[in-house]
Amino acid sequence: MAKKSAENGIYSVSGDEKKGPLIAPGPDGAPAKGDGPVGLGTPGGRLAVPPRETWTRQMDFIMSCVGFAVGLGNVWRFPYLCYKNGGGVFLIPYVLIALVGGIPIFFLEISLGQFMKAGSINVWNICPLFKGLGYASMVIVFYCNTYYIMVLAWGFYYLVKSFTTTLPWATCGHTWNTPDCVEIFRHEDCANASLANLTCDQLADRRSPVIEFWENKVLRLSGGLEVPGALNWEVTLCLLACWVLVYFCVWKGVKSTGKIVYFTATFPYVVLVVLLVRGVLLPGALDGIIYYLKPDWSKLGSPQVWIDAGTQIFFSYAIGLGALTALGSYNRFNNNCYKDAIILALINSGTSFFAGFVVFSILGFMAAEQGVHISKVAESGPGLAFIAYPRAVTLMPVAPLWAALFFFMLLLLGLDSQFVGVEGFITGLLDLLPASYYFRFQREISVALCCALCFVIDLSMVTDGGMYVFQLFDYYSASGTTLLWQAFWECVVVAWVYGADRFMDDIACMIGYRPCPWMKWCWSFFTPLVCMGIFIFNVVYYEPLVYNNTYVYPWWGEAMGWAFALSSMLCVPLHLLGCLLRAKGTMAERWQHLTQPIWGLHHLEYRAQDADVRGLTTLTPVSESSKVVVVESVM
């Protein structure tokens, strides 16, 4: 039976006394009774602990993970990296790093969230000394939520402008065009010098209306970061509309989010298939696909190829952001997260590979139409979405239809990644709030404040100098360097501080069997080595940010970027040092105490079953201000 210490209110349960499920006792020492929330005995009385929300169906979780992890990077970055780094040869380092780095950490984050039933911060109660990992992931995902939505705002703007008989970026003569503007030409026009009586060489020096629409109308690009300029109100309204969409996708929690992603995560695949069918029927499409896949074996020995593969894996798998942990925390305790993680990883990488056929069939057509090499039209990132593809659709029949389809797909790809990222941030935030702070509409108000704060910060990115701010966030705040640092410490903490075998046992408790030993080996050895190797390479061969190969950022702009990066990377060592300095006892005693897990209420039955192995377990009633029941394992 449970015994209460009269002095400190701690309930202890010895291993030989526990039979069956362990129920937290009430204030009189008797088991808590009644239906509804589980009772927690406290010196002041019984405290109701609200149950954690769970997915209505497991497919809701699968769709949410697909929507979050499969995003813009799969469509606009992977195909270009594959072409740039040797075509089909790039798949070799990509698959290898996925096996030793991407999939193991992807599985680690989901299973950790499911086991601890907590968001990105409280999930590190598994090893409280390293709770700084949770704060770091919150910082990174906040930065991502802030700048990532700008791509949606631009995409929404292009989508609205697509509903016209003539696309505004297809012709010159608008107020934003310059005298150097020349409308998009086909190869036969150039050969006949039929455009404004200019030769092909002269045409090459002119500016495309697509570029002028992007730079002069959408971005209203100023001279640099030091020239912010005024707000672009049209794009600002699109940004506001996107944040309103995100709010209503997230405000009711996973019950509503899990339904919305059925559309936002699946419809982009329908559009990709439609665009692929249209693309392969165009002249020159086959040449584009060949350029995409043609192997260049000499590239395999280049370190940059392996660095690009590793960075793409960690970025596209959405590792280190804490959102996967938050999504996993809403799973049933016995859900087979191992199978889910493998399936989701395959979907993610498969989508990247498939998107390459869509992109390069269109680029091959565009290269053939303009009589230029594929390298002249191949773009990555915003250049593909807002320059290369808009230019390509102007050469197609019924151009507005294909433009609208593409930007609608772009909007959906980014939207579910965005609102799941916000969900991950809100989950981590609300898990920290004690029960005494609970009030009606707590979640709705928290989501509104988060969206409003991000929107205010985003206003700096819809000014004339906004693109320079966007590039700072993109290059530093959630770069490969910060994600690799985060992933390295996650593996070290779980495998070497908590214990890889111990965590494998915890997973076996959830799914009924131990995962493949490969996962344990990766967490312990291979993955940390890969992460640290790429991290060191990125630091040693660091190159300052340059926009469009022309604009060099001032020293204070680069310092601002490093401040973004270090604000998350320093969370781990600073939190660790702070905890060790505040604790009492010898350094060994402090380490032992601070690395003891803090268990949640759902662990009681599980821990009770192996108490004879793990020793004494204590149920510690915390203050009434806390809504989390903790169990401290004394080992």
Swiss-Prot record:
UniProt-recorded name of the protein: Sodium- and chloride-dependent creatine transporter 1
Ranges per topology, Extracellular: 82-87, 160-230, 291-304, 363-394, 466-479, 542-560
Related illness: Cerebral creatine deficiency syndrome 1: An X-linked disorder of creatine transport characterized by intellectual disability, severe speech delay, behavioral abnormalities, and seizures. Carrier females may show mild neuropsychologic impairment.
One Pfam family recorded for the sequence: SNF
PANTHER family in UniProt: SODIUM- AND CHLORIDE-DEPENDENT CREATINE TRANSPORTER 1, SODIUM/CHLORIDE DEPENDENT TRANSPORTER
Gene Ontology annotations for the cellular component aspect, listed alphabetically: apical plasma membrane; membrane; plasma membrane
Membrane topology classification: Multi-pass membrane protein
Phosphoserine sites (modified residues): S623
Effect of R186H: 82.0% of wild type creatine transporter activity
Consequence of substituting M560V: No effect on creatine transporter activity
Residues recorded as bearing Phosphothreonine in the entry: T42, T617, T620
